[in-house]
Amino acid sequence: MAQPLLARLREKLPGVEIDLLAPEWVASVARRMPEVKEVIAAPFRHGALQLRERWKLGRALRLRGYDQAIVLPNTWKSALVPFFADIPLRSGYIGESRYGLLNLLYKKQAAAMALHYARLSEPPGKAPQQPLPAPRLRVAPGEVTAAARRFGLEGPYAVLCPGAEYGPAKRWPYFKELAQCLGIEVVLLGSGNDRESGGGIPGNNLIGKTTLDEALRLIAGAAFVVSNDSGLMHIAAALGRPQVALFGSSNPEHTPPASPAARVVWLHLDCSPCYARVCPLGHFRCMNEMSVEMVLQEIQSLNA
């Protein structure tokens, strides 16, 4: 969702070099962004302050002489490394009262996440030109072939992503029934935390058995992808794969799959989006009432 910001920076500043400080678990995806020169893997545990480690990294980056840091997360701790690196221009949203840590501050406005980030390419208060550049990831055809061979895939296959680490309110419960209707080899993808979601679904279950980069390459070779609102959904969109994205407690207007090859299924219930991890009303209608037939209809429309 942040890649349109990077593309817009390259448009506005020809010749600019962009390095990306990213968590290790997403670094492999960031390295496939054509706008990025170098990815620096952040050595921090999720949610941990690790003040000394942030200071050490900041002092090391000081030697690179960066002109500007754009801080995307809203947390206080995420602004520490650019501050310790003495980067002269440090911009981002106010977030957790980051006065001083950042010196070019933006006020949050309601918007889709891609637009939210793209605003950081303009002075505060100025809207970026639209439409925004579409996200895209680089994958060579040989990498796709090698990944399929590595996991024993010989013919066309569909990728299903039944997990969503955010919580049960984002997980559609009928992937098993869908897989039984497809008439094509099925590959299940997700992280180790998604293993329970893949239980009982017929197909080549690779959930928790691939790296993120391997999953990316398998998605790049898929005939189509069906997923919940998840990180793999956004990867499929950036790869331009035909896909159907299923939304329950979240809002496809806020975090859509940014691709013309994407279809969205969302029931528009009065209680949705609630953004809850577990249905606060106990009925889970936003996903329970999303039928297999609805999803199959959208899959069929991908080839129309």
Give the predicted meaning of each segment:
Residues 1-304:
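Catalytic machinery of carbohydrate-active enzymes
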